């Protein structure tokens, strides 16, 4: 009886660890999608040149600091 309990306990523990890994992977992939979307919004505008460290926001057509723009939202 004790042997079966320990086997079931180990199995459940492994299952929980695997579920945790999967959920972390989904969060990371979701974060990557959001960052990629933000990066696609920050493309250079052909009619506007921005200084080093800045990029053109396609929607507002203004230069914004790249690091600030990615983390403001």
Swiss-Prot record:
Subcellular location: Secreted
Propiece residues: 26-37
Tissue: Expressed by the venom gland.
One annotated Gene Ontology cellular component of this protein: extracellular region
UniProt keyword Ribonucleoprotein, yes or no: no
Function, in words: Exhibits highly specific blockage of Kv2.1/KCNB1 (IC(50)=41.7 nM) voltage-gated potassium channels. This blockage is not associated with a significant change in steady-state activation, suggesting that this toxin acts as a channel blocker rather than a gating-modifier. Shows potential analgesic activities in formalin-induced paw licking, thermal pain, and acetic acid-induced abdominal writhing mice models.
Protein name (record): Kappa-scoloptoxin SsmTx-I
Species for this entry: Scolopendra mutilans
């Amino acid at each position: 009886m004790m042997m079966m309990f320990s086997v079931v306990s180990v199995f459940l523990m492994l299952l929980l660890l695997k579920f945790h890994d999967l959920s972390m992977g989904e969060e990371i992939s979701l974060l990557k999608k959001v960052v990629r979307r933000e990066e696609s919004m920050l493309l250079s505008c052909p009619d506007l040149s921005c200084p080093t460290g800045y990029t053109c926001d396609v929607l507002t057509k203004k230069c914004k600091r790249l690091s600030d723009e990615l983390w403001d939202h």
